[in-house]
Structure formats: structure tokens, C-alpha cells
């Protein structure tokens, strides 16, 4: 798939902007704080209905305006699709081919994206919530049912925690009802995550072998808060461990086990990547991002769109070369933001170059020397 055009109204520093893209490589160039990342963020938001930079929709609306919109035309193997998101103080509206979507799980997945931004370099050493969000975003695009299961799980979890905080004595019968619902949805979430991580690890290992010239082995471990050896055991093990922690949950007023406590651990040559060098971290994340692209292609039969937000300057020449080689091999539509073409000397000649300046964007196709 590839996005053919994007239209913004009152988004960030864009009052009104439109751009038509090529199915290959598209580069946004301009000084800092001109709107390059904002435009890339809009593509990301149109796909996953969230920003990678802020949790507040208000931050996305142009100064003094009350609403904003993002719309785009997507070319998929199955045909052309029109996507639109409207944001206002009343909430969000998502549309596919002008039809309003009642649930996020009905919308997300229509356009798949893989984002590589500087903050992704914190994925290894950052908090577990970052790694859970990483799984949620990818799985939500690949398997819409995952979002439904996760939403139901979070709803029951919120109910259970509210109950634990409100009572001075446990009602075992009522808690058992909540436990049954929590385990039903939670075991599905964990099964989805387990299968995803196993597949992702295989792809990431291949890419890391290429990037490290065969000198390093990358592995990824799914660390569920519920102990189990086989996928078939997840439901019963979750139920048993949840019941065993009733008193603990009552005293601490929260739920101690479940997918909301899950984590991922990365290993390089069988050693925890937390202790790896900065260069190894960059290679790991680069491998992970290209593995996301490969896996989405495998599991859906269509290409995702790759968004590279100012990451070329974060990579040395060798890793830049490896990234561009991987992009060329995967043959996916790619967007790059940069302040200079200096880091992009190895780009192919046939690119679409867009100049971004003070909330305006204009196409200027050039040949790179």
C-alpha cells in the first residue's frame, strides 16, 4: 500500500496544506521547527489515530482554532481507500470512504505504518510501558481483533481496580466474576503478543545478522507477568495466579498480574541489551524497525508505509547504508525528514523532494549529486 495524497486543515502549524506523493521515496527537507515532523506525524496519526509526540489532541489543533482534520487517499492491493480523521473539543471522528467508524478496531489497520523516530532509541532502556505500547501499535494494525480484546481487558481491569479501592472487605463472588472476564480477555491479549514476538524475533534476528555483518545475534524474549510454558496454559495459569494474589491485590488496591504488567527483553549475543553500547542499541532498533516492515508484509500480504523522522543524523555512515539497503530491498513507500541532504548522499536519484517552510510544503524534485 502507499499513500497517494494527504490534506491537512488546521493541523499543528498548517492552516491548510496538501501534497501528492510518489510510491517510492519521499523526503521532507527544511530548517528545524518549520513543520517537517508535523507532516510526518499527520501521516502516522491518520494510520494509528495517535501521535508519537503528545497525548493531547489539543496540541494538534492550529492556534485559536477549535478543530482540525487529516485526510488522505490510500492505494491498497484491494483498491483505493479514502481515510479521514476529524479532531475537536467534542472528540474524534474516523471515516473510511466517508463512512463513520464506530470503533477504533474498525478503522486501525486500514493503513499500516512503521515509524522510526529518535525517541525509539529509548525502547530498550525505557520503561516497560514503552515496550507494551510498541506491541500494541503493531498488533493493532496487523490484527484488529487484538485491539478489541485489549480494549475489553482494559475496561475490566479498570473496573476491578476501582472495586479494590472502594471496599474494606472483599466479596469473593463479585471478584470472581471480574476475574473471569479479566482472564478471558487477558489470556487472548497474551496469546496475541506471544505469537507476535516469536515471529518478530525471527525477522529481527535476520536483519541484525545483516547489519552486524554476522558478528552479533539478536534475540527477543516476551516477559509475561503470568508464568506459563505453553500457549495453551495461559488461561488456567492466569486464573490460578490471579486468585492466588487476591489478598495482595486487596492490600495494594490494584491488580498485580496480567498483560498490563508485560515486558520485552532484548539480548545481543545472549547478554541483556541494557548493557550494550550506544552503537549496538542503534543497530538493534534499526533491525527491529525493518523486522516490523517484513512481518507486516508477511502477515497481511500488503506493504506498510515506512516513516523515518530525523533518524539519519542519529546513525553513522555504515548504519545509514544498511538502512537504505534494507529500504530498497523491502520496496515500500518511505518518508524521510531531514534538515540537510548531507546525510542522504546514498539515496537513489529518483526521489520526491518536498521543501517545508513555516507551515507550507512544496514539491521540488531534484537529482542528488
Curated annotation (Swiss-Prot):
InterPro entries: DNA-binding_RecF, DNA-binding_RecF_CS, P-loop_NTPase, RecF/RecN/SMC_N, RecF_2. This is DNA replication and repair protein RecF. The RecF protein is involved in DNA metabolism; it is required for DNA replication and normal SOS inducibility. RecF binds preferentially to single-stranded, linear DNA. It also seems to bind ATP. One of its GO terms (biological process) is double-strand break repair. It comes from Streptococcus equi subsp. zooepidemicus (strain H70). Belongs to the RecF family. The keyword Cytoplasm applies. ATP binds at residues 30-37. The keyword Metal-binding does not apply.
Amino acid at each position: 500500500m502507499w499513500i497517494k495524497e494527504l490534506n491537512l486543515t488546521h493541523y499543528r502549524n498548517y492552516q491548510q496544506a496538501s501534497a501528492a506523493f510518489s510510491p517510492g521515496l519521499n523526503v521532507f527537507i527544511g530548517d528545524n521547527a518549520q513543520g517537517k515532523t508535523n507532516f510526518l506525524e499527520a501521516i502516522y496519526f491518520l494510520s494509528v489515530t495517535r501521535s508519537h509526540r503528545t497525548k493531547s489532541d489539543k496540541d494538534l489543533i492550529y492556534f485559536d482554532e477549535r478543530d482540525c482534520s487529516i485526510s488522505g487517499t490510500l492505494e491498497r492491493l484491494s483498491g483505493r481507500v479514502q481515510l479521514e480523521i476529524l479532531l475537536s473539543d467534542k472528540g474524534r471522528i474516523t471515516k473510511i470512504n466517508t463512512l463513520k467508524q464506530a470503533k477504533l478496531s474498525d478503522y486501525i489497520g486500514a493503513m499500516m505504518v512503521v515509524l522510526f523516530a529518535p525517541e525509539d532509541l529509548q525502547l530498550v532502556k525505557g520503561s516497560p510501558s514503552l515496550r507494551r505500547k510498541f506491541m500494541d501499535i503493531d498488533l493493532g494494525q496487523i490484527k484488529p481483533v487484538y485491539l478489541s480484546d485489549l480494549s475489553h481487558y482494559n475496561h475490566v481491569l479498570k473496573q476491578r481496580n476501582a472495586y479494590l479501592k472502594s471496599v474494606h472487605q472483599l466479596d469473593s463472588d463479585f471478584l470472581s466474576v471480574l476475574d473471569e472476564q479479566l482472564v478471558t480477555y487477558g489470556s487472548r491479549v497474551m496469546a496475541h503478543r506471544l505469537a507476535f514476538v516469536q515471529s518478530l524475533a525471527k525477522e529481527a534476528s535476520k536483519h541484525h545478522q545483516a547489519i552486524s555483518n554476522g558478528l552479533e545475534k539478536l534475540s527477543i524474549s516476551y516477559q509475561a507477568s503470568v508464568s506459563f510454558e505453553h500457549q495453551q496454559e495461559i488461561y488456567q495459569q492466569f486464573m490460578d495466579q490471579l486468585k492466588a494474589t487476591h489478598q495482595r491485590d486487596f492490600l495494594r488496591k490494584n491488580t498485580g498480574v496480567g498483560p498490563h504488567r508485560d515486558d520485552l527483553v532484548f539480548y545481543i549475543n545472549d547478554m541483556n541489551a541494557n548493557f550494550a553500547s550506544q552503537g549496538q542499541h542503534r543497530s538493534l532498533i534499526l533491525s527491529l524497525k525493518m523486522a516490523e516492515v517484513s512481518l507486516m508484509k508477511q502477515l497481511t500480504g500488503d506493504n506498510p508505509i515506512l516513516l523515518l523522522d530525523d533518524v539519519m543524523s542519529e546513525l553513522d555512515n555504515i548504519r545509514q547504508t544498511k538502512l537504505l539497503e534494507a529500504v530498497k530491498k523491502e520496496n515500500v513507500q518511505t518518508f524521510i525528514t531531514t534538515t540537510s541532504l548531507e546525510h542522504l548522499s546514498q539515496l537513489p536519484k529518483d526521489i520526491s523532494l518536498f521543501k517545508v517552510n513555516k507551515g507550507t510544503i512544496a514539491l521540488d524534485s531534484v537529482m542528488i549529486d
